[in-house]
């Protein structure tokens, strides 16, 4: 029996169900052509220098296929600041606020082929401040980003590209103010009727007005009247 060498790429993402977890099998572990966690996700700490154009090199190319950069100050109190490949350069959203996307070239300036670039704002690039970054690359079976325009109907279907049933999804209005709404399959199994508010401190709540009454599938999810 050959032991597993943990310094080698011997465990790909096998049937990982979005952010909900759940690796289903080891039958093909170690085969060529598989997707590995380090190919699509990187936790990367850095120390900023106050330079308004500091480049952070994570080694993860998000600019090509798309993805999300999530930054949090580790030294001082500060917001969780997010930029993704959909909202574009010099724009951001924060998880503690109901505000739509903001525009500020001193936070996360741009996503690059090797990481991202920050400005000198204290939430992302303050001099001598330590930060943590969480970097997600769009990849089937792991992570996807979808932008849609609501139609004010009681039930609107939104297509996604995961290729599997999502384990978790988050909704946030970009053009207007609106709470972050989060659904996760572990909150209440086999139903989308319960969720949490990311920018709040309350307990779970009924979500039929946000996520509709239809469970997500491998190709789409449903939003209710409050989120379209």
Regions found by a protein language model. Name each.
Residues 2-228:
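Surface-exposed molecular-recognition determinants
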